[in-house]
Amino acid sequence: MQIRSFVYSLILCCISSTAIAQNSKFSGPYAQFGIGYQTASPSFSNTSLSAAGQSLTPTVSVSNASGFTGTVAAGYNFFSGTPLLLGLGIEYTPFPTSNATASASYSGSVGTYQNSASVHINNSLNIFIAPALALDQNKLLYGKVGYTGSSANGVNTDFYMGGTSLGFGYKQIISSGFYGFAEYNYVNYGSLNRSLSGNLKTPANVSVPATLNSTVTATTTNLLFGLGYQF
């Protein structure tokens, strides 16, 4: 009797889950926009200073950049016949991050050195897949895995940065296809080797050309709230 009850319960759960999937309002194409808060966090490693025929070790300090951000996105959620959906999407961030600043200094028997540079990331484009779970026909939990490419400006040049993006969020239908959402995203842009030219001042007060070399790693996080339309 207990086995029969268990089987009945399992069948009812399967039927209920299938009904949720079939009635989910989040299958098909969608478009959305979001606004929120973003933080860009650069870090530096393997930093060296070449000057006066020597390789010196400078001190590096970094300040993160935080501020307003906004995104627009579009995609398609594929119906799977279960409460699970799979989405494909593209997301564009037109707003640049604030400037993140790095300062390098050296003081020793060879002389003194001081230099700084600012970097900001802009025009980010993220292509992602989004596995999702329909809680009911109006509510959706989802994750995001993708690749983000961005242009960056700083350290006396423009350059490209790209890396893995991860995120998760929640959507809920408000009315007639319109929905609200909340979302958290993380991007790891990997590392790049960058150089910065400057001058080291010797104890005799003579300026000597110096080159700062470092491996730069950058990550960004953002928290978004927004509105969208499910077609």
Model-derived segments and their meaning:
Residues I20-F231:
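Gram-negative outer-membrane beta-barrel domains
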Residues M1-F26:
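Cleavable N-terminal export/targeting peptides
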